[in-house]
Structures are given as structure tokens and as C-alpha cells.
Amino acid sequence: MAHKKGTGSTRNGRDSNAQRLGVKKFGGEVVRSGSIIVRQRGTKFHPGVNVGRGGDDTLFALIDGVVTFERKGKGGKKVSVYPAGEAA
């Protein structure tokens, strides 16, 4: 017979790391080409003028310029980058 009580186990004790999603550059901010503007899952924000979309739906600047957030139809949002002189 055991003289020590065996320790039980638990089914908890796990947690995942945060994914660090969200807007990284806000409207009016100056960005360099290749800068990440939004990290997202799915297309909450759609790419607009001079903005590319990566395989994980990350939006990034294709040119140096100023970030603008715009409406896209009803309820949609898009992100564009315009050259610093002609920001909309």
C-alpha cells in the first residue's frame, strides 16, 4: 500500500500566445514602402491604392507616403497610401 498520496493531474494549464493583430500605422502617419499597416485575420480592412495584401491578409505599403482609411461601400473599410504631397 502506498504511504504517499499520489498527486492528481489537471486538464487546465495551457494558454496560447497573443497574435499581436491590429492597426500598426494609423491615418495620417507617414510610412515607407513595405511598412506593415494592418495585421489581421480575414479582410476586415481591404487594400486600396498603393497597398498590398500578404498571404496572411496583412496589409502593407507599396510606396512611401501617408496612410488614409476610407469607406468601401456599405460597412466596408479600405486602406490606401498616397504620396506625401497629395494625401487625400
UniProtKB/Swiss-Prot annotation:
GO terms for biological process: translation. Keywords: Ribonucleoprotein, Ribosomal protein. The keyword Ribosomal protein applies. GO terms for molecular function: structural constituent of ribosome. Residues 7-19 have a biased composition (Polar residues). One of its GO terms (cellular component) is cytosolic large ribosomal subunit. It comes from the Bacteria. InterPro entries: Ribosomal_bL27, Ribosomal_bL27_CS. The keyword Ribosomal protein applies. Residues 1-23 are annotated as: Disordered. HAMAP family: Ribosomal_bL27. Belongs to the bacterial ribosomal protein bL27 family. This is Large ribosomal subunit protein bL27.
